[in-house]
């Protein structure tokens, strides 16, 4: 689960991180009062969407030379003018795709005198099975580009969970970020604070980009991105309350109600599979034969008829889907249950696109019999390769 920047900063402020004063607003009429609560004379007006690249983004409704989704204002009047121009419009960034995201919230923040911009994040390093800091002196940039072009400028430092952030870890992080004086002293406090927030709140990512050194030599969290482990949300009611479903795909929200692992993609072949590995293999083979998957959908090992029906409805709700591939290997999951669910869903929502079904495993003969006797126009497949070829051919024809 993702949250907005202003929510992430409020959370980190609660742990003692150095965060600038700021006020979130939902209407342009709130802009003046919000700005008056801040010291000034510089203000930053920030679009709040769940996507990066806001500063370089463009609003669909504005002229191409209009400013992006993060704007500097030198007066309260400028804050108000920017708020009126940004709220309600659609911001397109490198992460939103061409459809963009509507800006329904702004964060008015006190400006900062920046001396240096740094990069810092904490994530789970799966190669060692530990939380790890990733830091670089190249802040405010796309860290993936830095990793590709100048990997020597990035330090990845795994943290032993039983010890937490040690003095030695702090020394290494300060050295990698070239911090000294007051900034290094701030680092001694900040690094353990961020690690504590990451672990206590079950985050999957905590990214500060940039972490800045101000002209007075002190550190400040200038931007913050936080993602949480969905599997741990039951422990954090306070975090769940921060969820903004307007930023999420409606189909993914519906899938979560049925405990379905669903991720919307940009292709035109819908997939319903059991098991994450088989689901990824199914998407790969669709791409191998020249098409693109419209989604990742894992119905799991113990899906009921109702769950399968819900999954099928979610797939068919995507207007981009031109064909559907059901690929089931029945271990715990029974093929007859899948067959009954698919038939129930087709009868309820109708079938306007080609449907290829490949079943194998537990009760496979019964599953195939149920489908063959259903009277539905379903294309059977013998194996995964055969299924992929048939659905791609059906969609292209």
Swiss-Prot record:
GO terms for molecular function: ATP binding; magnesium ion binding; succinate-CoA ligase (ADP-forming) activity; succinate-CoA ligase (GDP-forming) activity. GO terms for biological process: succinyl-CoA metabolic process; tricarboxylic acid cycle. GO terms for cellular component: cytosol; succinate-CoA ligase complex. It is an enzyme of class 6 (ligase). Substrate binds at residues 274, 331-333. Residues 9-254 form the ATP-grasp domain. Its cofactor is Mg(2+). Its EC number is 6.2.1.5. Pfam families: ATP-grasp_2 (PF08442), Ligase_CoA (PF00549). Binds 1 Mg(2+) ion per subunit. Belongs to the succinate/malate CoA ligase beta subunit family. HAMAP family: Succ_CoA_beta. Succinyl-CoA synthetase functions in the citric acid cycle (TCA), coupling the hydrolysis of succinyl-CoA to the synthesis of either ATP or GTP and thus represents the only step of substrate-level phosphorylation in the TCA. The beta subunit provides nucleotide specificity of the enzyme and binds the substrate succinate, while the binding sites for coenzyme A and phosphate are found in the alpha subunit. Heterotetramer of two alpha and two beta subunits. This is Succinate--CoA ligase [ADP-forming] subunit beta.
């Amino acid at each position: 689960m993702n949250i907005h920047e202003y929510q992430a900063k409020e959370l980190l402020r609660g742990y003692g991180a150095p965060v600038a004063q700021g006020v979130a607003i939902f209407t342009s009429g709130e802009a003046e009062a919000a700005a008056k609560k801040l010291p000034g004379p510089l203000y930053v007006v920030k679009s709040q969407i769940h996507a990066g690249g806001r500063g370089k983004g463009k609003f669909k409704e504005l002229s191409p030379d209009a400013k992006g989704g993060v704007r500097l204002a030198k007066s309260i009047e400028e804050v108000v003018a920017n708020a009126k121009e940004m709220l309600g419009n659609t911001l397109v960034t490198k992460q939103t795709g061409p459809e963009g995201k509507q800006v329904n919230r702004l964060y008015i923040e006190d400006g900062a005198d920046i001396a240096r911009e740094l990069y810092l994040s904490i994530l789970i390093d799966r190669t060692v099975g530990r939380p790890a800091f990733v830091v670089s002196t190249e802040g405010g940039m796309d860290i993936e580009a830095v990793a590709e072009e100048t990997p020597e400028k990035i330090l990845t430092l795994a943290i032993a969970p039983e010890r937490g952030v040690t003095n030695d870890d702090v020394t290494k992080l300060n050295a990698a970020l070239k911090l000294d004086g007051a900034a290094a002293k701030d680092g001694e406090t900040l690094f353990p604070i961020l690690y504590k927030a990451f672990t206590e709140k079950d985050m999957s990512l905590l990214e500060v980009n940039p972490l800045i050194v101000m002209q007075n030599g002190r550190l400040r969290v200038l931007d913050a991105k936080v993602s949480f482990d969905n599997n741990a949300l039951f422990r954090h009611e306070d975090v769940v309350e921060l969820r903004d479903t307007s930023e999420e795909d409606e189909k993914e929200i519906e899938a979560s109600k049925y405990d379905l692992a669903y991720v919307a993609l940009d292709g035109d072949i819908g997939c319903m599979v059991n098991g994450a590995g088989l689901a990824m293999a199914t998407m790969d083979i669709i791409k191998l034969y020249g098409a693109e998957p419209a989604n990742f959908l894992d119905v799991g090992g113990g899906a009921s008829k109702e769950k399968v029906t819900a999954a099928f409805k979610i797939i068919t709700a995507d207007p981009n889907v031109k064909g559907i591939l059901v690929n089931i290997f029945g271990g715990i999951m029974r093929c007859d249950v899948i067959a009954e669910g698919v038939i129930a869903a087709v009868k309820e929502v109708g079938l306007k696109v080609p449907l290829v079904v490949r079943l194998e495993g537990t009760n496979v003969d019964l599953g195939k019999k149920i489908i063959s006797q259903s009277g539905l126009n379903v294309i059977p497949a013998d194996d995964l390769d055969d299924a992929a070829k048939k659905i791609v051919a059906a969609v292209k024809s």
